[in-house]
Amino acid sequence: MNIIDRFEQENISKLIENKKIPDFKAGDTVKVTVKIVDRSVEKDGKEKLTERFQAYEGVVIAKRNRGITSSFLVRKISHGEGVERRFMTYSPVVHAIDVVKYGVVRRAKLYYLRERSGKSARIKERHMHIAKKPKAKVAEAV
């Protein structure tokens, strides 16, 4: 491992120490919570900063794994128009990433969804089977 890779790994570990990044891929529906800082000037001339969180939910159509510059592209339909937004995976602006549902696709990049709408743009859902815990045996009274 060279110096640059080590430096990137240290920075990534610092950036994700207080947030969990789930394992997701193209075709999955994610909900990304982004921190937005609004600046407003009050009447007396003072600048006021307000923070709020905004959720963006859509289908991941591309994921780019490149160390600290990793990113993913999320597409959603808003008021009949397709909207795409690229998020940097390790950015401090990204507050949380939640996987809403897992999709079944056979491609790594789903750019073909840009030309599709309605039923043809649907993605099958992958059902995650979670192993059930075995029931504890209850001792019978004799």
From Swiss-Prot:
Pfam family, one: Ribosomal_L19
Keywords: Ribonucleoprotein, Ribosomal protein
GO biological process: translation
UniProt xrefs under Gene3D superfamilies: 2.30.30.790
Any one annotated GO CC term: cytosolic large ribosomal subunit
Domain of life: Bacteria
Molecular-function annotations in GO: structural constituent of ribosome
InterPro entries: Ribosomal_bL19, Ribosomal_bL19_CS, Ribosomal_bL19_sf, Translation_prot_SH3-like_sf
Protein function: This protein is located at the 30S-50S ribosomal subunit interface and may play a role in the structure and function of the aminoacyl-tRNA binding site.
Entries under PANTHER family matching the protein: LARGE RIBOSOMAL SUBUNIT PROTEIN BL19M (PTHR15680:SF9), RIBOSOMAL PROTEIN L19 (PTHR15680)
Family stated for the protein in its record: Belongs to the bacterial ribosomal protein bL19 family.
Protein name: Large ribosomal subunit protein bL19
Species this protein is from: Rickettsia bellii (strain OSU 85-389)
